[in-house]
Amino acid sequence: RTALPHLRKSKSPRIVNIASTEALGATGRDSPYAAAKAGVVGLTRAMAVDLGPEGITVNCICPGPVRTGMTAPIPEDDKNTYARRRTALRRYGDPEEVAHMTLSLCLPAASFLTGAIIPVDGGLMARNA
């Protein structure tokens, strides 16, 4: 709500929420986390409908396995095994790859995209669809 007055004054207002692939297909390891991220997905869709008439786009990125502080404690061998078995690209992503997708949703080329839920997951959800 605090940002809305500023977004309304912007030439190309964008909101990009970050959820997780856990919101799209829970692994059963952490139900509260999956539920919270699913809430972000629902909020994104509701905001897209509510703010669309004002020209504000709202989209959501759902990172999959990415090398972050959250995944740092996982042994490297375990990460590699998981990625080979579960992702089409057979690797963990880098934070920069998520950042680049976030930036791309703020470019003029994305001006007609709103309410989208975009997995940035190396093909994890494609294999689980």
What annotation goes with each model-predicted range?
Residues P5, V49-P53, S111:
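Alpha-helical segment proximal to the catalytic Tyr-Lys
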Residues S20:
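Residue(s) in the substrate-gating loop at a strand-loop-helix junction
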Residues S12, G52, T57, L113-G115:
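Short, small/polar-rich loop/turn modules that mediate ligand/substrate recognition or access, typified
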Residues A36, T44:
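Active-site helix of classical SDR
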Residues G25, T102, T114-A129:
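Short C-terminal tail/terminal secondary-structure segment
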Residues G25-S31, P53-E54, R90, P95, ...:
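Active-site loop immediately N-terminal to the catalytic Tyr-X3-Lys motif
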Residues L24, C62-P73:
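Short, flexible catalytic-loop segment of classical short-chain dehydrogenase/reductase
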Residues R1, R45:
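A short, exposed helix-loop element centered on a Lys and neighboring polar residues
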